[in-house]
């Protein structure tokens, strides 16, 4: 199974005792995966889900909260779709469910984001809303350069509401328009881990963290072995050469190295094959790759000028053929 499937299976088993948290989860599930339509003069709510466990959970919660019958149907695969879908259908008292779940106002007007009760609710309700949104349209990719936790949203208002809920539980999330749909994205690895724990997917977090740590350990050893691309090899040579020059610069300047330049230089020396972007992420506080490059450049320029004044070899003497041949 995929990591996303594992997370949804785990979330579908999360025990929720507070009625307000159940209501927040249901509200998000209906908003992010549901559709309201009039059939034969009656309002009907339909929710399309990719997990039977999630469909049964939604059925149970709605029955408990609103004392109404809920139907669950299996939609067999067809066309380009290889896996079955599960349709949760609310016909009886659908208008009452829509109002109490915060899909519409008391006067029947559509609420495009999340309900005010969820937005201004407790921390546990914000967590429950995120759990519902992820069960409705969430995904998590394996750790890597482009790893991200994403939730597909029905509209911009819903996306902004979800970002607000993330902020309330201490997680930074951003909205983006991708492939014609609104999405909420969490990219920072620590934030992804914290969010998984918050919504109840602790076991999945451990699996994801183990994969991430394994990749971080394996990547430096494999990096040069996989350098079939000439551009990557050139980048590695340039990074190693820069590290050698930085070491020479530190010796030339001694205690006269400005602290902010020394910090950038130490990052370059300690992580010889890392890209400038990676060095920026390792800095505390984090910097852009341009800021890192600028500081290293000023460090080398300052050291080369000092070397000329002292009549000694500058930083370029540290870059030898033997050093580059090792790559």
UniProtKB/Swiss-Prot annotation:
Signal peptide: none annotated. The lineage of its organism: Bacteria, Bacillati, Actinomycetota, Actinomycetes, Mycobacteriales. The gene is whiA. Belongs to the WhiA family. Involved in cell division and chromosome segregation. PANTHER family: CELL DIVISION PROTEIN WHIA-RELATED. One of its GO terms (biological process) is cell division. This is Probable cell division protein WhiA. InterPro entries: Homing_endonucl (IPR027434), Sporu_reg_WhiA_N_dom (IPR018478), Sporulation_regulator_WhiA (IPR003802), Sporulation_regulator_WhiA_C (IPR023054), WhiA_LAGLIDADG_dom (IPR039518). Keywords: Cell cycle, Cell division, DNA-binding. Residues 275-308 bind DNA. Pfam families: HTH_WhiA (PF02650), LAGLIDADG_WhiA (PF14527), WhiA_N (PF10298). GO terms for molecular function: DNA binding.
């Amino acid at each position: 199974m995929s990591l996303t499937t594992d997370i949804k299976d785990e979330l579908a088993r999360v025990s929720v005792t507070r009625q307000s948290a159940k209501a927040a989860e249901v509200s998000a599930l209906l908003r992010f995966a549901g559709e309201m339509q009039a059939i034969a003069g009656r309002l009907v709510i339909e929710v399309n889900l990719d997990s039977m466990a999630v469909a049964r959970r939604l059925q149970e919660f709605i029955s408990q909260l609103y004392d109404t019958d809920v139907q669950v149907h299996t939609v067999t695969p067809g066309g380009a779709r290889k896996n079955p879908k599960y349709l949760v259908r609310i016909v009886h008292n659908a208008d009452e469910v829509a109002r109490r779940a915060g899909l519409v106002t008391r006067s029947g007007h559509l609420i495009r984001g999340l309900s005010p009760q969820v937005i201004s609710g407790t921390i546990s309700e914000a967590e429950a809303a995120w759990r519902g949104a992820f069960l409705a349209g969430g995904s998590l990719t394996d750790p890597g350069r482009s790893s991200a936790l994403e939730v597909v949203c029905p509209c911009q208002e819903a996306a902004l509401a979800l970002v607000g809920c993330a902020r309330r539980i201490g997680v930074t999330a951003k909205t983006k328009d991708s492939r014609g749909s609104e999405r909420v994205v969490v990219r920072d690895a620590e934030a992804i881990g914290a969010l998984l724990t918050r919504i109840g997917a602790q076991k999945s977090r451990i699996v994801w963290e183990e994969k991430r740590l394994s990749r971080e350990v394996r990547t430096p050893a494999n990096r040069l072995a996989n350098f079939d691309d000439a551009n990557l090899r050139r980048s590695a040579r340039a990074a190693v050469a820069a590290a050698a020059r930085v070491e020479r610069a530190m010796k030339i300047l001694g205690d006269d190295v400005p602290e902010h330049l020394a910090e950038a230089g130490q990052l370059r020396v300690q992580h010889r094959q890392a890209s400038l972007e990676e060095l920026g992420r390792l800095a505390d506080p984090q910097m852009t790759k341009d800021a890192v490059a600028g500081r290293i450049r000023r460090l080398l320029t300052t050291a080369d000028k000092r070397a000329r004044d002292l009549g000694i070899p500058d930083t370029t003497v540290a870059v030898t053929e033997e050093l580059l041949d090792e790559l």
